[in-house]
Amino acid sequence: MYRFAPSPTGDMHIGNLRAAIFNYICSLQDKSGFILRIEDTDTARNISGKGEEIKEILKQFGIKWDKLYIQSENLKFHRELASKLLNDKKAFCCFCSEEELAAKKAAAKKAGVAYRYDGTCEKLSDLEVLNCEKPFVIRMKKPNRILKFNDLIKGEIGFEPENIDSFVIMRVDKTPTYNFACAVDDMLEGVTCVIRGEDHVSNTPKQNWIRECLGYTEEISYAHLPIILNEDGKKMSKRENSSSVKWLLQSGYLPEAIANYLILLGNKTPCEVFTLDEAVEWFDISKISKNPAKFDISKLAFLNREHIKRADSARLVEVFGLDESFSELIKFYTQEASLVGEIKEKIKSIFSKKEIPAEFAENVKILKDEILKIKELPENFENFKEILTKATNLKGKNFFMPLRILLTGANHGPELKELYPLLRSQIKRIVNL
């Protein structure tokens, strides 16, 4: 069982989408099932509507979940299992105030050493705990051995006990921390494999330790994906537009192209252009590079053009909101535009009233009048050109530039001989606008 567990705290990052896609593909390969879990326990950072937005984005990418969980609905289980850890002496109540901890952290920094919890409250007797009326958090007891796990991408990874430390699992307000809620939910929901970003590597031993202390013996496999770098070779910030899946979709990149690119990123694939469904046939998580991958927006633009070319008429109607008769024209314009909006603008320009530059106005009118006189437009552009040049005596720039403006509303663009067959049936309507 695989899962994708985003938090509704902002726009979905492409790194998160990449993890969702990989988990989904692997769940289809072994038919184990796919869970979507909205991790909403950080109420201070939650943004209204983001949970639904996450679901809508996944649907656009064709990602279907077998089960949906809302993490906050598991709060009673989090508290029950935290209580079990206390009873089993695997966890303890910590009454240290924020001010006390801040002072200890400052002292450690001044001494040039990493801060570690000093175990003050772990030493308290049961009676001392009961008699203390101060607010408290619950901490796990630090492990007494190296915690190791085998990463499906990075290989074996180990963490010394001091790097695990006595970490907090329940806050003062009795809500679970990320690591505790995540560890418990994965256990309760039967998750068997987790694919996520490498920023979670240090969380994995903590989550494994929590489950071990709870007596859970089922193994969960992990794969941690290298980070995605921006085009400057730096870690991609959430503030960068291209890191937001919502922004990419609104900018005119197709879900098919984005998925294609994210699967291709840092991966060895048998071909360059493919769909998510096609990737299910050959995807291998172990072949993902251990090194960070650099995001290349121009490569994504190329893939966007390729997926527009591959799309059937029904899909193009859905994406562009244009009649099916425009399908070939849409594909034609991928030779000079990559985004949905750019292509729509070029087509809109053809079928709108033209702004004619004064220097071409006279020749445009001459060409328009002659085109409207032609009873039946010829099949090919050469014959069309021959008819017009004979009738108007216009040549070279005086012919081609006004004709291009009359037909497309643009000074530059694709070869008219290639565009003509696609517009032929509509040309009289176009010039009459």
Curated annotation (Swiss-Prot):
It comes from Campylobacter hominis (strain ATCC BAA-381 / DSM 21671 / CCUG 45161 / LMG 19568 / NCTC 13146 / CH001A). Its main location: cytoplasm. This is Glutamate--tRNA ligase 2. InterPro entries: aa-tRNA-synth_I_cd-bd, aa-tRNA-synth_I_codon-bd_sub2, aa-tRNA-synth_I_CS, aa_tRNA-synth_I_cd-bd_sf, Glu-tRNA-ligase_bac/mito, Glu/Gln-tRNA-synth, Glu/Gln-tRNA-synth_Ib_cat-dom, GluQ/Sye. GO terms for biological process: glutamyl-tRNA aminoacylation. Catalyzes the attachment of glutamate to tRNA(Glu) in a two-step reaction: glutamate is first activated by ATP to form Glu-AMP and then transferred to the acceptor end of tRNA(Glu). NCBIfam families: gltX_bact (TIGR00464). Keywords: Aminoacyl-tRNA synthetase, ATP-binding, Cytoplasm, Ligase, Nucleotide-binding, Protein biosynthesis. It comes from the Bacteria. ATP binds at residue 238. A motif ('KMSKS' region) lies at residues 235-239. It catalyses: tRNA(Glu) + L-glutamate + ATP = L-glutamyl-tRNA(Glu) + AMP + diphosphate. A motif ('HIGH' region) lies at residues 6-16. One of its GO terms (cellular component) is cytosol. One of its GO terms (molecular function) is glutamate-tRNA ligase activity. Belongs to the class-I aminoacyl-tRNA synthetase family. Glutamate--tRNA ligase type 1 subfamily. Disulfide bonds: none annotated. Monomer.
